[in-house]
């Protein structure tokens, strides 16, 4: 009996030890997280979140020792490969503009102080995102995404509101059809060609073969004829449930799909008397000929004869094949936009969304956070910054929440916050490029800074409301603190902002169109343009700068739409430049 009791006591002791150890580990883990949050210490790995796509091959993350400037791999004692950066010459005989094209992308930047309120699932944010004119990149910053109480400031981070906002943004973006980019080369105009190439081209091979009904057949005229307008062909939407009803070999109305491979290819790459549906020929009364090709046949226009490596692809992707149907269904299921980064620091939240096909052209993504709140380091105030390369152009996006208050000392504190964010924001280089120095904000070619900057209007409460009632925005801007600082060059020297031709965005009564009035606790609050979007860098054009009438919080959201130029590496132009350089070298040697 005594032995049984002793064994039971040992078991209880073991369980107590295990529970105490687990509790101690949990305490240490919680303390570690809180200390990291207090002193704004980043983890060794990137701690931002992003969408994952199993079907997407992220080529930007692949490492190629040759293209990355790293050669002569060595192996350490553990079998790990050590790469040594190779030396690069300082001056190149090949000028950059000889192998670079320019492309314009549309960027929609939005900022909103949501006051710690969680959105409902039916909240309409289409106006804030400007979905009527879809952008290629959406840079959205939220402030006070969680209430700024002691628990959220000093305790564990609550990411549930961020998830709800992301779901709302995702639903809004994926209800629209993204635009196509127009490739325009200023330094290398296209040479005369027999065929007039379309201005809009697909971004990937899969988009080349799967298009919407109004893009299925675009006219390509000869050089002597102008491009005539043609009626679009309605393409039925195929559901997955109807796959069993599809005749793989085609119906009686589609005789081409029943032809042998050789005869089918001859039809596709010749000029038949009776054209196939996918390659139609129209001859009008004026004997003007117009050829209409689908994107599948346009690939063949680059060669005088059908390329052998594409013959099987044409046959397998013709109408009625399983491959074309499955490809269509797969692309219809994929979202139009994907989230490439989301980062939260207490109440400051920055999320960036891009077109799905633009994702592979984004690289060197890095995140930096700077807390300037309590004790100058806590993240209740501060910035979340993202650095990335879009094609070959470095961009920097910042979401900030600066110190509040209407006193003169509060304005100086905001100025100090901006200088501190500039000083402490650093984007560490990739581990393989250890010789490079950390990149600061000003080391980027295009910069967009948005957020609740909290700058006020230096007028009395009564005078401010009087100018607002008369909509005299220009006179009101003369007393805006941020506009004055930028004009004097004390802050954001060389930066730009759109015209403030809308009412101040702060401070409103909740779910109301009225500015907040007399408050026994806080007194009179003067309206102000607290929510701002400014930018720096050449090659950026502002389309619109406006506020949106969403009454969720005491702030109104603000949107700015830009057209930004990016540099795109042109392999054809690079090969041409290298050929000329090689010829010059051979001439000097001779």
UniProtKB/Swiss-Prot annotation:
Residues 47-73 are annotated as: Disordered. GO terms for molecular function: inositol trisphosphate phosphatase activity; inositol-1,3,4,5-tetrakisphosphate 5-phosphatase activity; inositol-1,4,5-trisphosphate 5-phosphatase activity; inositol-polyphosphate 5-phosphatase activity; phosphatidylinositol-3,4,5-trisphosphate 5-phosphatase activity; phosphatidylinositol-4,5-bisphosphate 5-phosphatase activity. One of its GO terms (biological process) is phosphatidylinositol dephosphorylation. It comes from the Eukaryota. Gene3D superfamilies: Endonuclease/exonuclease/phosphatase. The keyword Ubl conjugation does not apply. Belongs to the inositol polyphosphate 5-phosphatase family. Disruption phenotype: No visible phenotype. Slightly reduced production of reactive oxygen species (ROS). Alterations in germination and in early seedling growth. Enhanced sensibility to abscisic acid (ABA) with elevated levels of Ins(1,4,5)P3. Pfam families: Exo_endo_phos2. Residues 445-460 are annotated as: Catalytic 1. The modification Phosphoserine is found at residue 60. This is Type I inositol polyphosphate 5-phosphatase 1. Residues 523-538 are annotated as: Catalytic 2. Induction: Induced by ABA at both transcript and protein levels in a specific, transient manner.
